[in-house]
Amino acid sequence: MFRARHLLGIEPLAPPEITTLLDLAETYVDLNRRTVKHSDALAGMTQINMFFENSTRTQSSFELAGKRLGADVMNMAMQTSSVKKGETLIDTALTLNAMHPDLLVVRHPQSGAVDLLAQKVNCAVLNAGDGRHEHPTQALLDALTIRRAKGRLHRLTVAICGDIAHSRVARSNLILLGKMENRLRLVGPATLMPSGARDWGCEIHEDMREGLKGADVVMMLRLQKERMDGGFIPSEREYYHRWGLDAEKLALAAPDAIVMHPGPMNRGVEIDGTIADDINRSVIQDQVEMGVAVRMAAMDLLARNLRAERGAKAAEMMA
């Protein structure tokens, strides 16, 4: 069962809803590997992608997902939109709502902006990342990648390493993996740990070698310099020496540990290129593949709920 009206974050989702979405995504993995990659799940529906921040993987993934489901997909060019002329987010939302879209996919630099927008529209809204808050589809695709690689999504030791403080990916993964009863570790310099991290029910390790010991999953995060307003690290060279993932540090993890990265990667900063390209350990390209399938599943489920809601309202009006 999946009851969500929007997909704004992982926090509101119950474990059975997460499992339902991942199970449906599995069917879309199979569809995406066929010669004809098409479904009519969103036939007759309109999807609008609004990205107030630059994106390659997420935006193209959502666009491809919508088209493979049969939706009419429109990408708004935010750099040339009325937002640049001073229009508020709410006015933009109201304008789009008047066009009767069915799904809005939104990325915004301000935490909470997508939640605000969702309150102003009648369609389903998917959060493609808002500030430091959440990135729900990234956590879901990571979960699917882990489940396929490890055969389960519970009782695993997961080390999330790097710039935790500025990462919405880390936050969403912590919530999701915590709901599924995993052992979680945050690894990185104290300057890149969020305040209150010790209250999140996970281990904190400033020493990367300690943090990686016996880990089943090693998730690397890039330095988000665009969200930094001060000197958080001495230098990239020093950072790589202490917290960059190389063969010597990875050897401390479980022998069958997988290596993940949400992208974009900074090779030689948070991860060595040979590790990123190691087909026996790295599942980074699998994450990209799972991203399309997970976004297809999310939009499919939200569309079903939207149709049911609209059908109930229509029946009520006719009664």
Swiss-Prot record:
GO biological process: 'de novo' pyrimidine nucleobase biosynthetic process; 'de novo' UMP biosynthetic process; amino acid metabolic process
Catalytic activity, EC: 2.1.3.2
The protein's annotated pathway: Pyrimidine metabolism; UMP biosynthesis via de novo pathway; (S)-dihydroorotate from bicarbonate: step 2/3
Catalytic activity: carbamoyl phosphate + L-aspartate = N-carbamoyl-L-aspartate + phosphate + H(+)
Superkingdom to which the source organism belongs: Bacteria
Protein name per its UniProtKB record: Aspartate carbamoyltransferase catalytic subunit
Binding site for L-aspartate: 85, 168, 222
CC annotations in GO: cytosol
Organism of provenance: Paracoccus denitrificans (strain Pd 1222)
Family: Belongs to the aspartate/ornithine carbamoyltransferase superfamily. ATCase family.
Pfam families: OTCace, OTCace_N
Assembly and interaction partners: Heterododecamer (2C3:3R2) of six catalytic PyrB chains organized as two trimers (C3), and six regulatory PyrI chains organized as three dimers (R2).
